[in-house]
């Protein structure tokens, strides 16, 4: 019997320097939700009214669904199209961190919320038409056999679809509410920014190997898919934020991030500046030093608690 050869990954022979660069960024950014003191937000949570609490739980449940998709379907689908073993390794890291993100929302729920309210939100997520629709749209492309279209769908999920949900904790944070929860969300946003950038980079590398007509076809596909997702996301936003008066602000944030998603793919912005004008308070809440709780690049800060090792001495054991 003839055995096929199996090659071990060799990080000392890199075919694409971007793989090592992004691997190092992702591993240096590694974090876990257990290190964020979410319990410090209990007093602020209790001051939210019932409608605000329900909205927050629903927002985070919707985000959990997207992270679940990216963990179990999105990143694994991209791994099958990897051009290098190092790209495959980076995508496996991305897949794992999406699981961490999904776990993080459960940490928020178990710390701040009543189980019955969380259970109700999960039921809501399975019955909400726009939420289920965007999941189905993305999953359909992940199941296809067209690698570059998979990457387009993945970039739109990473760099656009999350942001109708990310808006809310940034809004609360800008008003001094749920600041530790916002720190955790910033950790997630930092990861998603790297994910969207990297997958977009791999998409642009893939374009180098196809014809001009195929490139044009993919560009049209990308813009058409974005508009399909945007129309659905606008409906989702209108339903989710219906009673708040914040719908227009969230839609502006969507347009802003849709343009960023297109830029990750190497394309020009679609939405004009007047449609993508985000409230400065939200942009300030997104900034690396918002609330001075969080170091955006190192993952450390007063809200991310890391233990310090101290050498013991003989006297320490004299009880």
Regions found by a protein language model. Give the residues of each.
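Non-heme di-metal
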Residues: 1-319
């Amino acid at each position: 019997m003839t055995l096929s050869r199996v090659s071990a990954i060799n990080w000392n022979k890199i075919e694409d320097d971007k793989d090592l660069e992004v691997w190092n960024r992702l591993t240096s950014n590694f974090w876990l939700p257990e290190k964020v003191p979410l319990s410090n937000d209990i007093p602020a949570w209790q001051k939210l009214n019932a409608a605000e609490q329900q909205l927050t739980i629903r927002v985070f449940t919707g985000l959990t669904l997207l992270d679940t998709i990216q963990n179990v379907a999105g990143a694994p689908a991209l791994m099958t199209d990897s051009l290098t073993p190092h790209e495959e390794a980076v995508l496996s890291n991305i897949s794992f961190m999406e699981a961490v993100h999904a776990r993080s929302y459960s940490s928020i729920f178990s710390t701040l919320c009543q189980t019955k309210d969380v259970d109700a939100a999960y039921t809501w997520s399975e019955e909400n038409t726009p939420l289920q629709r965007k999941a189905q749209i993305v999953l359909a492309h992940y199941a296809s056999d067209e690698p570059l279209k998979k990457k387009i769908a993945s970039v739109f999920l990473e760099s656009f679809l999350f942001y109708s949900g990310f808006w809310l904790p940034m809004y609360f944070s800008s008003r001094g509410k749920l600041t530790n929860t916002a720190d955790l969300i910033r950790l997630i946003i930092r990861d998603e920014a790297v994910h969207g950038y990297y997958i977009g980079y791999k998409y642009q590398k893939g374009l180098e190997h196809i014809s001009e007509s195929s490139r044009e076809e993919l560009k049209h596909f990308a813009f058409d898919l974005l508009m399909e997702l945007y129309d659905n996301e606008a409906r989702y936003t209108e339903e989710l934020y219906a009673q708040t008066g914040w719908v227009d602000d969230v839609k502006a944030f969507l347009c802003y991030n849709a343009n960023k998603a297109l830029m990750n793919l190497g394309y020009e912005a679609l939405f004009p500046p007047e449609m993508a004008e985000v409230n400065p308070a939200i942009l300030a809440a997104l900034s690396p030093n918002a609330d001075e709780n969080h170091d955006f690049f190192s993952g450390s800060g007063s809200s991310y608690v890391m233990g310090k090792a101290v050498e013991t001495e003989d006297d320490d054991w004299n009880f």
